[in-house]
A protein has these predicted regions:
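The feature captures the beta-strand-to-loop junction immediately N-terminal to the Walker
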Residues: 31-36
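Helix-to-loop junction immediately C-terminal to a conserved catalytic motif
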Residues: 49
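ABC-family P-loop ATPase nucleotide-binding domains
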Residues: 79-136
Length: 178
């Protein structure tokens, strides 16, 4: 993924959140983005996935500008946002509706991840706590087997054992050569 001369502001009257940001992110590695609250970390992630449009510059995934929203590009990354809502139906239906967008989706991987987080496959998403919803989305995201997994504050809302399980799960996934 390459980001070139990316600038963004939420309002034309205010200062830019990001100004002429350029970087290259190599596939198959874990990166962390550190900074104070409100400096644009989440904004950068949304720009990287094409959910926000930069005022200048561009972000490309495998040579394709993410703003084009091409299916082959969209199916190669998954974003776990810091805050999200899940529909009020069971996980099986969620998987049935969303997994087809990810050609490498691995149902066995999903089941293994759910087991690690002690979540049943038939959970009703609308009845879960925020931490449980985060665990369910992490399990789904890892099962997509995308080349790029972008996570915004992935352990927010997880209890201490959940954070430990998350780290173990991520290490296992990296060792299995995503």
């Amino acid at each position: 993924m390459t980001i070139e001369h990316l600038s963004f502001g939420y309002s034309k009257r205010k200062n830019r959140v990001l100004n002429d940001c350029s970087l290259r992110i190599d596939e198959g590695k874990i990166y962390g983005l550190l900074g104070k609250n409100g400096v644009g970390k989440s904004t950068l992630l949304y720009l990287m996935t094409g959910l926000l449009t930069p005022t200048e510059g561009h972000a490309c995934l495998n040579g394709t500008d993410v703003r084009l929203r091409r299916p082959d590009t969209l199916s190669d990354f998954f974003l776990i946002p810091e805050e999200f809502d899940l529909p009020d139906y069971n996980l099986q239906k969620y998987v049935r509706l969303n997994a087809p967008f990810y050609p490498h989706f691995d149902h066995e991987n999903l089941l293994r991840n759910l087991e690690m987080f002690e979540l049943p496959e038939d959970i009703k998403l609308g009845e879960l706590s925020m931490g449980q919803k985060k665990k369910a989305l992490i399990c789904f995201a890892l099962a997509t087997r995308t080349s790029w997994l972008i996570m915004d504050e992935p352990t927010n809302g997880l209890d201490i054992p959940g954070k430990s399980q998350f780290r173990k799960l991520l290490i296992r996934e990296m060792n299995e050569s995503r």
